[in-house]
A protein has these predicted regions:
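Single conserved hydrophobic/aromatic residue that forms the stacking wall/gate
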Residues: 1-9, 13-14
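Metal-dependent amide/peptide-bond hydrolase catalytic core
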Residues: 19-205
Length: 205
């Protein structure tokens, strides 16, 4: 969360607006991602909300930005957060404004263990057949509290397909207001949990 605050008086002719400064901060964050991080070190910096003012003929006192940062490692996450905080604090100063950061640390990166992922794969193939298991081609920046468990224990975070039949490739994502869930998939999810437990107990991995 970032707050850009005007420091000048109330006369519009001499008051700097935080709106263009907020836009500059947004652009600088995108440049930070592409210039300070390797393409082999994926990061995401999303400005999901900008709020400033209440009408079109009054210069607002403040501009607020809500920003989400994600990465595939803890070290990269810290570098990204540090870089974004520096931009928010320094760019407004060049315009006579003040930038404040309220950093709320979310969940750490969700990183599977190879052994845990192998258990899930074996259980899924045994329960659903080879066609019922699919390895994701690229890493997914999941933000999950399960990541805390993965920091301490061997395990894996897996997805359960819940798209209604006949909608593969066309179904809305789970965070969409158009999402439709095949409720029969819940039975598959329960069976998968049981299959994973049995796979571990049988010592097949």
């Amino acid at each position: 969360y970032a707050l850009l605050r005007s420091l000048v008086g109330s006369e519009m002719c001499i008051r700097d607006s935080p709106v263009p400064v907020a836009c500059e901060v947004v652009q600088a964050i995108q440049t930070l991602v592409t210039r300070q991080f390797s393409v082999f070190e994926p990061v995401v910096a999303t400005v999901g909300r900008i709020q400033a003012g209440t009408t079109n003929n009054v210069i607002p006192e403040t501009a607020e930005l809500d920003i989400t940062l994600r990465s595939l490692s803890g070290d990269t996450r810290e570098r990204l957060a540090s870089g974004v905080c520096n931009l928010i604090e320094q760019i407004p100063v060049a315009h006579g404004l003040q930038g404040e950061v309220k950093l709320k640390r979310g969940y750490p990166p969700t990183i599977n263990h190879a052994a845990g992922a192998e258990v899930v794969a074996k259980a899924a193939k045994a329960l659903l057949g080879e066609e019922g298991y699919r390895l994701m081609p690229d890493p997914f920046m999941a933000s999950e509290d399960f990541s805390y468990l993965l920091q301490r224990y061997n395990g894996a975070f897996a997805f359960l397909g819940v798209a209604p039949p006949g909608t593969e490739g066309k179904a809305a994502p789970c965070h969409s207001n158009h999402m439709l869930v095949d409720e029969d998939a819940m039975a598959v999810g329960v069976a998968m949990h049981a299959a994973i437990v049995l796979t571990c107990l049988n010592g097949s991995v």
